[in-house]
Swiss-Prot record:
Keywords: Cobalamin biosynthesis, Lyase, Methyltransferase, Multifunctional enzyme, NAD, Oxidoreductase, Phosphoprotein, Porphyrin biosynthesis, S-adenosyl-L-methionine, Transferase. One of its GO terms (molecular function) is NAD binding. It comes from Neisseria meningitidis serogroup C / serotype 2a (strain ATCC 700532 / DSM 15464 / FAM18). CDD domains: SUMT. Its EC number is 2.1.1.107, 1.3.1.76, 4.99.1.4. This is Siroheme synthase. In the N-terminal section; belongs to the precorrin-2 dehydrogenase / sirohydrochlorin ferrochelatase family. In the C-terminal section; belongs to the precorrin methyltransferase family. Residues 214-483 are annotated as: Uroporphyrinogen-III C-methyltransferase. S-adenosyl-L-methionine binds at P223, G299, G300, D301, V304, T329, A330, M381, G410. One of its GO terms (biological process) is methylation. NAD(+) binds at A22, V23, K43, H44. Pfam families: CysG_dimeriser, NAD_binding_7, Sirohm_synth_M, TP_methylase.
Amino acid sequence: MNYFPIFANLAGRPVLVVGGGAVAARKISLLLKAGAEVRVAAKHLNAELSALAAENKILWLAEEFRAEHIRTVFLIIAASSDQALNRRVFHLAESCQKPVNVVDDRDHCSFIFPSVIDRNPVQIAVSSSGSAPVLARLLRERLEALLPPSLGDMAEISGRWRDAVKGKLKSVTERRRFWEKQFNGRFAALVKNRQNTLAERELAKQLEQNYQGGFVSLVGAGPGDAGLLTLKGLQEIQQADVVLYDALVSDGILSLVRRDAERIFVGKRARGGRTPQEDTNALMVRLAREGRRVVRLKGGDPFVFGRGGEELETLARHQIPFSVVPGITAAVGATAYAGIPLTHRDYAQSAVFVTGHRKADAPDIEWQTLARSRQTLVIYMGALKAALIAERLQQHGRSPDTPAAVISQGTLPAQKTATGTLANLSELAETAPNPALIVIGEVVGLHEKLAWFGENAKKESNPAEHAYFALDGLGTGQEQQAA
C-alpha cells in the first residue's frame, strides 16, 4: 500500500491553493464542495476564479505566494504553471509538516487526489497511487455506471433510521444483518424508483418483523482463480458472519471474505488429516442456531464430488433455512486454463466426470463405460490411484496410446499441466503436486496448440518419459482482467 486511503473533513478549514488558472480552478471546485475555506495565492485569476472571488466564495490574497501563507492553513495545493514555484511550495510545506499536493508531480506530494465517485453522502475513491491516472479514471467511469444515482438517498434515509434500528436491535450482528437485507431487498428497489416515502414505510415494516434466525449458504468457490468466483458467491461471502472453508479454497478467494467474519477451516485431503464430515455438519447446525449467517465455502462446485448434498440433508433435517450458489467445477475451469476442450466435434462427443475417492462400500465402477473412445474422462482425486485407473481402462479396451494429462493447481498462478499417454499416467501423477485432476481422451492432444494461460505458455521438460509440463499462470486472473 503506497498511500493510506483517508477522507479528510475540510468543512470550515482553511486550505491554500497556489495558482490562479484552470488547474487551480478544478481543484478549488472540489474543495468548495467539501466546505473548505479556500485561500488563493496568485497575482492574477482567470475568469472563473474571479467570479468566485467577487461572490466571496474564495479569499483571493491578490499577491504571489509567500512563506507566511502556509502558517495558518490546514493543507496546501500547488497548482501554478511555474514548476520552480510549485516545488518551493512543497519544500516549505514539508518543513512545516503540512500536507501538500503539487498537481501532476507525484514526487512532490505528501498526498494525492483519487478519482471520486460522488453519491453524497456515499463517496468512493479510486487511485493508482499516481502510477496510471488514466486507468483510475476508467475504473471510476465503470463504477459510475454500476452505482445508481439513488445510492445517496439510500444512505441518507438509512442514517435517519440508524437510531431506531439501534434501539430495536441490540447486537451489532443483528443490525448488520438487518441493513444487508434492506440494501438487497424491496427497500433498495423503492429508493431506486424514487419512492422514498414508501421506502421508509418498508423499513418500519421490516424492523417490526425482523427475523432473527440463522441461515446457511452453500457456496461454490470455483477452481482457484478468484476471478472465477461468481458475483452471487462474492455477495454471500461478504455478508457472512462465519465462513467454513475447505483446503481447495484459494487464498485469493479467502481474501474476499468480509474482514470481520470468523473463518473456520474444515478441510480434508486424501494424503493428510481431515475434519470428519459429521463434525462439519454439526458445526453448521450449531452456528445457524446461534442466529449467525453461515457460508459453507467449498472448492469448485458444491454438488460435484463436494458432499454438498449430504450437508444440505443435515440442514433440512434440522429445519435450518439454506441456499445454494453454484461454482465452476475444477473439470471445467482447469481444462479451460490448460487449453484442453472437454468436447470437440472431431475428438469427443461427451465428457464424463468421476471421482477416484469413494466410500468403502460403494458399488464397482463401470469400467466398460469409462473406457469408451471418443469421450473425455475427467477424474477428480485420482492421483493416488492413477496406476490402477490406467490398468483398468486398458483392460476394458482403452488404447495405451490415448492422450492423458494431469493438471495440478488448476487456474492458479502455479498451474502445471503434465501430458503423456494412458500408458505412463502413473508417472505423470507421481510428479504432479496436489490438488491434481486427471484428464484422459483425444482432446488432450490439443493442449500444446491451445495452451494460453500465462504470458508465454512456456514448456519445460518432465523426467517422466514421453511427458512434458506446461508452466501456466504467470499472473492471477484478476491481473489479466485488469489489463
